[in-house]
A protein has these predicted regions:
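Minor-groove-contacting beta-hairpin "wing" of winged helix-turn-helix DNA-binding domains
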Residues: 1-2
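Mid-protein regulatory/catalytic core that forms ligand/cofactor-binding pockets
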Residues: 6, 10-106
Length: 106
């Protein structure tokens, strides 16, 4: 995808991870990464590259099967995602959906 990229700041608990990612994907976006700020190590980034519901399902299954905590668990749920949308209109739709769900943090 080569479109509009934006870094968004979100906050939620581990239980809301799937809903957050699907909100982005179902509204036409791609989730490239997740980044958290650590007091000692600085920014810690995990590559995601999620483009479909199947990608999200596989990611969530891996997290469950490995009993892994989401990266944002070390930052009180605050994290950023680099997301991408094919058009500015779709990016706006994604942001409005995230805001409606209470995921955006400012």
């Amino acid at each position: 995808m080569s479109g509009i990229k934006r870094t968004i700041v979100c906050k939620h608990g581990q239980a809301e991870t799937e809903r957050e990612l699907l909100t982005i994907i179902k509204n036409g976006g791609t989730v490239h990464n997740v980044t958290v700020e650590h007091g000692v190590y600085g920014n810690l980034e995990g590559s995601l590259h999620l483009t479909s519901e199947n990608d999200v399902n596989r990611y969530m299954k891996r997290m469950k099967n490995t009993n892994a905590a989401v990266l944002s668990s070390i930052s009180g749920g605050i994290h950023t995602h680099l997301i991408e949308a094919p058009t500015a209109e779709i990016m706006e739709r994604i942001l409005k959906a995230l805001e409606k769900e209470g995921f955006l943090y400012s």
